A protein has these predicted regions:
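Structured helix-beta-strand junction loops
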Residues: 15-16, 200
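Double-stranded beta-helix
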Residues: 132-138, 144-207
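Non-heme Fe(II)-dependent double-stranded beta-helix
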Residues: 1-15, 22-127
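Short acidic/polar capping segments at secondary-structure boundaries
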Residues: 98-106, 116-117, 143-150, 157-160
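Residue-level preference for the first positions of well-ordered beta-strands
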Residues: 18-20, 203
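Sequence-level detector for tyrosine residue identity
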Residues: 18, 71, 89-91, 108, ...
Length: 207
C-alpha cells in the first residue's frame, strides 16, 4: 500500500518527537538514491578511510545531483513535511544535508546526545535551553535506503530536560560513547547494543 498521511503522523511527531513516513519514496527514486549513494560512499572512504560515517554536504561533491533534487521536490514528501511542521518548512537542501554511511570494517555507535547541546563544542547552553521547544529548531529527516534499525530515541524527551534516571545512568554531559578500544567485531556489537538499550525509556526505530 502506498503512503497515506494521517493525523497520527502529526500527533506522533509532536508527542513522541518522531514520526515514520512508511513507503513514502517510490521504488524508482530509492534505486536512483542508492546508486548515487554508492558513489558517495566511495568518495567518502577515499577521503576519510573505511570507518568514515558520512559525506556532507552532498552538493559540494562530484555526484549526480538529480536524485537529490527529485527527493527534495517529491510532492508527497513536501506535503507531509508541511503538514507535520508548517508550509514554511522545507527539506533537501543539498548545501546542508549528507549521506550517513555504515562503517566498513568495525561496528560503531554514536554517543547518546541531544542535537547541538551535546555535539556542538562551545554552544551557548542558555540559548539552547531557550530554543528547546522552538518548532524551527532540531528537526531532521532520515531517509533510509535499506532496512535500517540503527536509530535509537527516547520518545517524548524533546519536550523536557533530562530526567533524574537518565542523569543517574549517564551522569556526564556530554554523554561519552562506549569504550570500543581493542574489542573484536562481536564484542563491539554487544557493547554498542548494551550501551544504546540502557538509556532509560529508549526504543529502537525500524525504518
Amino acid at each position: 500500500m502506498a503512503f497515506q498521511f494521517s493525523d497520527q503522523h502529526i500527533e506522533d511527531f509532536h508527542m513522541l518527537g518522531y514520526t515514520v513516513f512508511g513507503k513514502i519514496l517510490p521504488p524508482s527514486l530509492i534505486s536512483d538514491l542508492r546508486q548515487v549513494s554508492n558513489v558517495a560512499r566511495k568518495i567518502a572512504r577515499e577521503r576519510g578511510g573505511p570507518q568514515v560515517q558520512r559525506l556532507q554536504p552532498v552538493g559540494h561533491f562530484d555526484l549526480d545531483q538529480q536524485p537529490f533534487i527529485d527527493y527534495a521536490e517529491l510532492p508527497v514528501l513536501v506535503d507531509a513535511v508541511a503538514k507535520v511542521l508548517t508550509p514554511d518548512h522545507h527539506h533537501g537542501d543539498r548545501d546542508d544535508f549528507g549521506i550517513l554511511l555504515e562503517p566498513a570494517e568495525m561496528p560503531y555507535c554514536t554517543a547518546w546526545h541531544r542535537d547541538w547541546r551535546d555535539n556542538i563544542h562551545g554552544l551557548n547552553l542558555e540559548h539552547w535551553n531557550q530554543g528547546l521547544l522552538d518548532i524551527n529548531l532540531f528537526n531532521q529527516i532520515n531517509c533510509a535506503l535499506y532496512n535500517d534499525s540503527c536509530t535509537w530515541i527516547v520518545p517524548g524527551s524533546h519536550l523536557r530536560h533530562d530526567l533524574r534516571s537518565e542523569v543517574e545512568r549517564f551522569p556526564d554531559r556530554p554523554i561519552p560513547g562506549p569504550n570500543l578500544e581493542g574489542k573484536t567485531t562481536e564484542e563491539r556489537e554487544y557493547t554498542c547494543l548494551t550501551y544504546c538499550s540502557r538509556m532509560p525509556g529508549a526504543v529502537q526505530l525500524h525504518l
